[in-house]
Amino acid sequence: MKPSILEKLQQLSDRLEEVTHLLGQPEATSDMDNYRKLTREHAELTPVVEVFQNYRLAQSDLADAEEMLSDPEMKDFAAEEIEAAKAKIGELDTELQKLLLPKDADDDKNIFIEIRAGTGGDEAALFAGDLLRMYSRYAERNRWQVEIVSANESELGGYKEVIARIVGLGAYSRLKFESGGHRVQRVPATESQGRIHTSACTVAVMPEADELEDIELNPADLRIDTFRASGAGGQHINKTDSAVRITHLPTGMVVECQDGRSQHANKAQAMKVLAARLNDAQKREAQAKEAAERKSLIGSGDRSERIRTYNYPQGRVTDHRINLTLHKLDFVMDGDLEEITNALIAEHQAELLAAMGD
C-alpha cells in the first residue's frame, strides 16, 4: 500500500478517536446540529478504521510468521501462516481502497426515472411499460416507493413517455447506471407473421434535488402554462385546467405534470422534475469530461449510448458496457436486477481504483 494512503488511514483513525471523545462529552447534545454532524461522521469513519485495524493486525501476523521461519521445527507452519497473512493483507488492501473511493454525494437520494419510447412505434411504447414494471418490481424488492409523476400512454397500452419517482435510501446508487438506450428484440403482439422486431427506449435516471436547494430556479426563466389533463388517446379526464407545463426558457427544457390531484400539486411536482433535470444536465456534463479523461464506459452520462439488449427468443439480457450476458430474461423483467447492478457498480469501482493508481 502506498505511504500516502497509509498516512490518510492513520489520519482517519486519529479523527475517529477525536470524534468519539467529543460525542462522549456531557455538553455534546447542547448543539444538536453539531451533534448530528459528529454522529454522521462517526458512522462514516468507523467501517474504514475497523478494516484498517484488521489490516495492521494481519501485517503483525505476517511479521511474527516471518520470524518463525528461522526455527526449523516451525518452518512449514510459518510458511502456511505467511501465505494466509499475505492473502488476508491483499483482500484488506483492496477493501480499504474501495472504502477510500470518493463518495457520490447523490448516492442516497431518491430518483426520478424517465422512460421514453424510441424507434419501434407501439411496440417501443409497450416495452417502455415493461421497463417501468421492471424498475417498479426492483423497487418493491428494496422496499422503495414508486409514484407515477407523469404519463403519456399509447393507444395499445404502454407509454410514449413516463416519469416515475422512486423514494428510498440508496435508490440513486443502485440505479444510476441504468441511463442510456435499452433495446428489445422480440415478436410483437401485433405481428401476425411471427417476425422478430427490434425496438428501443431511452432511460434517464436523475437524483431528486434537495428541496430545490441543489439548483437555483429564477422565476424569470420559467414559463408556466396550465391545461386540461387528458388520458390515453387524448380524452379529457377532468374539466379544470389542473395540468401544468413548465418551460425553462434558457435551456428549452419542458416538463408536464397532470397526474396530481390539483394544479398546485402538479406545479410542485413539475418544479421538482425540472430541478432534477437541470441538476442532472450539469452532472452529466462533468461526468462526460471525467469519463473522456479515463476512457470510461460506465457512468459517462451518455444517453445516446445503447447500453443493454433484451432478447426474448433467446431469453437473454446483455449489458454491452461490461460484456455481461445473463440467460434469465424472465427474472430480470420481474425486477431481479441485483446481478446486473452489482456488476456495474464493481466495474465502476475498478475504474475509480485504476484512476487512483495513476
From Swiss-Prot:
Residues with the modification N5-methylglutamine, per the entry, are 235
Please give the Gene Ontology molecular function terms for this protein.
Answer: translation release factor activity, codon specific
Query: Which PROSITE patterns does the entry mention?
Result: RF_PROK_I
Question: Which top-rank group of organisms is this from?
Answer: Bacteria
Q: Does the keyword Phosphoprotein apply?
A: no
Q: Which GO terms describe its cellular component?
A: cytoplasm
Transmembrane ranges? Answer: none
Localized where?
A: Cytoplasm
Grouped into one coarse class, the protein's main location is cytoplasm
Share the record's PTM remark.
Answer: Methylated by PrmC. Methylation increases the termination efficiency of RF1.
| Keyword flag Cytoplasm | yes
Q: Which Gene3D superfamilies match?
A: 3.30.160.20, 3.30.70.1660, 6.10.140.1950
Q: What are the protein's UniProt keywords?
A: Cytoplasm, Methylation, Protein biosynthesis
Describe the task this protein carries out. Answer: Peptide chain release factor 1 directs the termination of translation in response to the peptide chain termination codons UAG and UAA.
Its family remark reads: Belongs to the prokaryotic/mitochondrial release factor family.
This protein is called: Peptide chain release factor 1
Q: Which organism is it from?
A: Neisseria meningitidis serogroup B (strain ATCC BAA-335 / MC58)
